[in-house]
């Protein structure tokens, strides 16, 4: 009877890996899988399993072997066939092939089965080895056996040579042999190791005591020194053996017990026991201490080292265990669907696979990969199911397989066709096979006579000969439908198993779920090494069956219809029984997660993994004759397994498609951005030409209509320039080419510039623009001020656009302090911000009508920098709040969308809708955020944050600046009096702003709220009460403030003047009744008083002895102010203006460092500031002393007349309206005023771009109203006291020359002041500030950045008007609307622009008529008007300037005609070509000698006389002007010396003017200068730019040369400094400006020339562009659009050479 052996072919061996884990399998599932796949036709087999390896295959090897150790009787009964009793013996230790033939049912490759002597005698070797443990324990147990064996031989050796110690050695030999035997038989490894350590220690210590005792006995009776020395040497040798044995015991502890705690315990115990033994030897055996010390120190040292090593090793083990634990979790927690498979047969999957394919793991048993990935079926296909079997000898076959063991083959069919071609190699066995189609068919089995009645398989594939690749449509997956992934030969080569072994294969295919849904999947196929390092560290549940001699496997099962197999696998005490009954004689062919490990000594193990169709009857005869039997042996117990990761990339594919579409859209968008960028740059060129041309035309002689249209052109061009700039910025940001600058700037100056750009538009709408800055905010910052200002201006422009009444407030606060080293102060800063924000609104607690501020306001400054040495970063918040229409909540989310506008129509509010979008992007670039809060119908609050830096760890905050100002006042005036008083304005927010600024200098004033008539008081009180109840709620405060402000605005004309007078009087009385009233100074700041209140307080203050300084709040809407007011506090309120006011009160001069900090001025500016301030004060003091008596008399005479009128005194004179034509001039002016809104749709637009071109300018109103007192006396009782004190004294910064300034003639003084850009205000104080304007005279080109300059409007007409109610209104026609016309004219005044005096920013003043011969003509003379006092006066002053054309669109400036109080005549000198006459107003004729008004008949007679006098004066002026023109022409043609026209040359040459001003003596006289006409070279490829710039230069008496490109420029420059200045365009097609400049600098070096002044021309005015210009050798750059004021600044700085 043949012996049947079943063996499995395995995958080739591979080295193990311990870094990857595999999924878990329970033993129950494994048993079920095994039993479900074992065919009922297999009779009587044994399974012997191994513990360390797993073998998973799909083949059956039936081997006939003889085994003497295991006898298994397998019985099988069958009704249809003869019973065959087969004795199948499987030898675990030495499998042997006895049968000459073997039957191989194999779809995998074959391996050679090697046999060796060691393997045949494995059973004998196992006797001397320990039982199977886990690998680490097994190795330690082998070491223990080795030590026992070694000690047996050592003790035997010592027994021979050291016979005196034979009892110890005999005990050692016996104990070691016993321990060795016990170790091989028991699994109690730790107990045996512990006994071994204990026995070794006892033997070793006994040996030490014995040698010590012998040494003492032998040395007692020895007297010879040599003998004693020999004994000592002998003892030392034996003691050395003791120490070595002890050290070996300590090392063994560390080896046998790897756990740190247990090993340390044993080590310490052994050392303690050693110490005890040596103590006994010292006291009992008299052992020498040196030997004891040696025996103690050596083991302790070794123990310490070993303990340290054990500790490090334990840490490493913990890390390894943690790493393995993480690896075990990777499988289940992976985001990829992981599949463990063998040749496409699914072994295990993770939870992600279940989610992707929507199937449970339990349903995946017996599944294949291609059921879910159909296109991978061809990957695992090989042949058509015809396995070749050869009849050659076994040895030859094995040799061939051994030669090709390392070569992998794969035969993949054409997956695109239904017909499959199979190829096999004669000398190779394919690695991967198709289990669907390549199964063993019945024909082959019948021919082999292996099985009878073999049936086709039904579970996998009934079509044995048809091999289909399930081609799934890829239309919904993003893959191509044209071909499969395995269609061509290249794919076959690429997807071969050879490539899989080298590197993983990644491919995209189509996945299908059981529901039929398709998706695109990315599959990664790779081969992993077996990572089984033991059952405790692997995620597999292995069936570790320890096979001993006593193991028996009995498989008995009887069934009438089936052959049943019962496999009883015994592993010590574990028995696994599985039964399988199948009535259909069919079994599942796929085994999932079956791992049966066999062969303890790395021998072959058999695994039953796949059984094909089988018959119920076996023919052993055909089996022996037709089959071949190959016993496949594995070299190693560890093998490879295949891993497949699947990722659902449907979304990725769709995203890729969308990404491609997005890329195409981005390309189109980029093309549009490039187009916009190019067009924007190109459009700016003609716009710059338009604006410059308009500025040139504005200086010519135009009538009112022409000037009106010219203003429309200018406003339209400004609007278009802003649109183009927004589009350009937007396109740069979108293209990612936008860069921010980092420069140092002054926050206060930047905010003032921003507010003044928009203030004129706000003033026209009646809106207050206020500033609130928290005290802890730094004022010197590093960042991009241009972009911060742009964001603020965008917010301000929108706020003003959507606000019709109320106010717009700019608030700055600290959000957070970003410190590089410490961030501990962030909370403090935030708390300060909250407190300071509350401080802005707590003035609205209006329980009483008069609200005061206490001294405990929360103005804490807690910016504590704890030793930070780096730059501090602050996150500042800029907020713009308005009381406008508000925004609906549903619209807020769309506000920052590009091109979005409220209401969806740009016609109502204009604009492109890019402002907020650009602001948002700029804020993001600056590291901040943008936000908005709005209540519809109440107002909005837009805010943004920006990260700005400071250059110091102790930044200068606003609070520290105020403290410095307060300290400066104390130093300059040690006996400084206490200031008290109050503030009043019709808008409570204006008072709050003033209060906050004054509080910085420790000046606390009370605030008086607006007092409305009785019908509105209730409403205001309710609002005030609401403010009291909601001080801590910012939103409520804002709303209530807005309501309160709206009430004030609605009732501007309903202010209760009587009640207001009563409140003022009470406050003044309260301050005057103070006991120490001598040192008490009363400071009062109010808006303009009514006529009755003004007269009342004049009389009241004259009766008081206190020092009362009454300042008026003025926004230059006033035509003139009464001398009752001590000074003016300008609107919009700013810190510099208030500082000037406070220093005037104390009669002190501002220190230089504080002046520069407030104004950004230079040292020269400060010197001029002190010089002209002292000169004017000194001269005016003398004039006031001379005229004091006359003015008092005139005031007394005119008092009755002025008090009888209801209008204020400053409206006594009618407005001036003189046009170039005599007929219909008044109608033209009136029509222009009436149609102002309709004349230009952009009249309310804020010209942001032009306002921002001139950076670092402070657009403050320059000329305040004059001291206009018709009574002729000074009503200010304190003016004499102020003027009598020399303000130079006590100032440490004054030059010595300034203290000895002699009195100047008033005409010379004013001429010098005008030439320096300084202006004398009504309080004898010089205002010397910068402001933004395109013309120094405030023409229609003045941008929306300043305020109107005050003037006395005078309307002169030739005919009488009987219906005129005003004394000075004379019209040609009878018109009842004169008052309305006058009012319109009064409300439309422009700025008289003056610039700060510095070399870089100098602008010529208006013409000053010094005497009858010397006239200094203005540069920009259009329709000049000369207003002069009588020539008999010692202080005659004639001012030539432009006419106020009264058109609100043109915004022409008004002039301040000084009044000669003595002669009471006002002479107006016109220089019009058509009407060249002087208009003289004689106030004695109008008011009479006593100051009273005369009847109308007398007035008409006086007017006729005046007209005659005017005609005579006009004729004289015409002659003078003709002479002047002839002289000027001769001077230009002959280039004569300056002579009598010295001042004219100064004005026409800013460079000479700067030099002359610096060389002025104390009297303001300048030394004679020999002038020459300056020459400029313009290098620009655009004709328009050359033309415009040349015209501007010619107006300033410059000669101009041209060059179209750099090559022509190089030809023009032939000698050293042949041009005073060169304007170089940067972008030119032929040799641009940068290269031309470099070539010029090289030429200068070669020829040793002095360098030329080269200024770049470009629309880019950023600091980064400026750095590029400087790097190439340019001196500076001039930004476009070029205005007259920027051109003058450039010429002043680079328009000549000093050396």
Curated annotation (Swiss-Prot):
The keyword Signal does not apply. The chain crosses the membrane at residues 142-162, 164-184, 191-211, 238-258, 262-282, 295-315. Its main location: membrane. The keyword Nucleus does not apply. The modification 4-aspartylphosphate is found at residue 1625. It is found in: Membrane. Residues 1575-1695 form the Response regulatory domain. Residues 7-32, 544-593, 1219-1239, 1283-1294, 1355-1392 have a biased composition (Low complexity). It is a multi-pass membrane protein. Residues 412-432, 1198-1212, 1271-1282 have a biased composition (Polar residues). Keywords: ATP-binding, Kinase, Membrane, Nucleotide-binding, Phosphoprotein, Transducer, Transferase, Transmembrane, Transmembrane helix, Two-component regulatory system. This is Hybrid signal transduction histidine kinase E. The gene is dhkE.
